[in-house]
């Protein structure tokens, strides 16, 4: 069955969702160490934790190798996260961190694949998912649907592919009030140099 991802940059660059998965399976361990070394996960945790109860229940969309789980635990989060990712290799690495309770292999944009998680989370987080790979306007509504009223969402976007006025408009339409914005540069390495803007927002009660 055709996936919405097939029409995004993922589909254009790799030909299919299966090819995207294969690419991330191939460089998973290298990616894990490169992203941790960039300092971006620690920056996300510093920006997010002031808005969270340490016992909050959260979900990590596009969790990859679990770098955000590690960073949030280091910053004082007590609870294990749930996580979703397309790559089995990445999910295996995330499991090894010991920071995740449940891990699900799923395509975020495929109807029904993420239905195993209840829409009751205190917070959700995503970094590296929205931007060049998955357009924010496709991903953000799915992510917001997993949150309870009043929950916190931390989401990073690649600014070069995400118009700020359009992102802010969609955030408001989804009931998100932006609380903070942090710039997170990623130096060139396994990935080309890029700049993430990390937003912390609260979903209307």
Language model regions located:
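A short acidic, Gly/Pro-enriched loop at the edge of an enzyme's catalytic core
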Residues: 114-124
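Core SAM-dependent methyltransferase catalytic element
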Residues: 189-205
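A short glycine-rich, Lys/Arg-flanked "PGG" loop and its adjoining helix->strand segment in the class I
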Residues: 137-149
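A short SAM/SAH-binding and catalytic strip from SAM-dependent methyltransferases
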Residues: 123-136
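Class I SAM-dependent methyltransferase SAM/SAH-binding core
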Residues: 65-112
């Amino acid at each position: 069955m055709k996936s919405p991802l097939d029409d995004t940059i993922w589909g254009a660059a790799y030909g299919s969702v299966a090819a995207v998965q294969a690419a991330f399976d191939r460089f998973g361990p290298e990616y894990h160490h490169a992203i941790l070394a960039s300092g971006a996960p620690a920056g996300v945790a510093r920006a997010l934790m002031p808005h969270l109860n340490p016992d909050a229940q959260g979900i990590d969309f596009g969790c990859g190798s679990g770098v955000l789980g590690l960073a949030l635990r280091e910053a004082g989060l007590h609870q294990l996260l749930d996580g979703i990712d397309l790559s089995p290799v990445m999910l295996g690495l995330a499991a090894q961190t010991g920071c995740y309770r449940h891990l699900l292999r799923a395509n975020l944009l495929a109807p029904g694949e993420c239905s195993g998680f209840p829409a009751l989370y205190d917070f959700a987080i995503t970094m590296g998912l929205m931007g060049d790979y998955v357009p924010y306007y496709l991903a953000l509504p799915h992510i917001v649907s997993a949150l309870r009223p009043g929950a916190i969402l931390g989401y990073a976007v690649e600014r070069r592919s995400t118009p700020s006025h359009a992102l802010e408009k969609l955030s408001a339409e989804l009931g998100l009030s932006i609380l903070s914005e942090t710039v997170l540069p990623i130096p060139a390495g396994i990935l080309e140099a890029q700049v993430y803007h990390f937003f912390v927002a609260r979903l209307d009660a």
